Amino acid sequence: MESAGIYQTLSKELGSEVYYQRPGGLILIETEEQLAVMEEVVANQKKCGMEVEIISGDDARKMEPYLSKNIAAAAYSALDGHADPIATTLAFAKKAKELGAEFWTHTQVTGITVKNGAVRGVQTSRGEIETECAVVAAGAWSPFIGEMVGLDVPIRPRRGQTMVTEPLPPIFHKELLCARYIAIKHHPELAKGSDDPGLKLGVGLSIEQTEHGNLLIGNNREFAGYDVSTSFEVLREVCNYVTRFVPFLKDVNIIRTFSGLRPFCEDGSPIIGATKALPGLIFATGHEGDGIALAPITGELVSDLIKEGKTKHDISSFSYDRFIK
């Protein structure tokens, strides 16, 4: 919630547009089993102060008339929003440069210098940077940084594949997800023993319409190593599943596909903060598919930790130290 609050004024603060919008969102529910899961999720979200509720399938169709009769109910939040991830990244980088930051692109980190049991530098393909603080923010590649100092970072790359349609007139007013997609996110074991080919591949539904009219249609969650290709097998299952919810999409043209790797942490929570294992090392990784959503608050927490040695929120439950036995 705090990250969403930051996004509302982020374009003004950074001096560059991040294209943040807040249209609200629906998580579509097909079965009684899914409904029971989402009722528990919504109850927990309400305890955290989130404005979210379970609505009927008919009410969901009033919001999005193209939805099929397969939808029994939905979880609805008027506060769901999104930003352009590329524009947001570039806006942060531009502002950082204005404030004196230096970026070394196409530069490989080759090691961490440790002296007297603490971080004293970062070794790169362009030379060494002397520093008493190093932030591990390498996403799915964070385990390779951990190995440099003997730490086992329990993160695996989790691929997601997305399709982009031809531009269409404004069709969808809300962001759309499905309950199965949420369940697979937190319980990847659900996909293992299933006879459903789509479920085996971690296929769910996510639909978002861009300001240019293109639909971003996905998605799936699969452990495929560091392979960033797309596959016909997965995209076919995504199409089969998505058209159960929005039948007219079977007649829409796909113009391109892409994939990305999410940093999946073994216990489902990100790793944020310092560690007793190595003073000077700070983690900001393992956000899985929530990286862009949680980027502003994560950056603020890490910045406070570096400057003040503490954060305004208790982040101890996100510490790497929870994995030290």
Feature annotation, model-predicted:
Residues M1-M63:
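Dinucleotide-binding Rossmann-like beta1-alpha1 core, especially the glycine-rich loop
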Residues S56-G57, T105-T107, R256:
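Short loop/edge segments at beta-strand edges and connector loops
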Residues S16-Y20, T113, A118, E128-I129, ...:
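Active-site substrate-recognition segment that forms the wall
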Residues V136-A137:
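Redox-cofactor binding/interface segments in oxidoreductases and associated redox assembly factors
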Residues A75-C133:
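Helical element adjacent to the flavin cofactor pocket in flavoenzyme catalytic cores
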Residues S3-Y7, L35-M38, G57, T89, ...:
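A general structural signal for well-ordered alpha-helical segments in protein cores
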Residues I27-V37, Y76-K94, W104, S229-V234, ...:
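Short beta-strand to alpha-helix junction loop
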Residues I54, D59, A101, I271, ...:
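C-terminal lid/capping helical subdomain adjacent to the catalytic/cofactor pocket in oxidative enzymes
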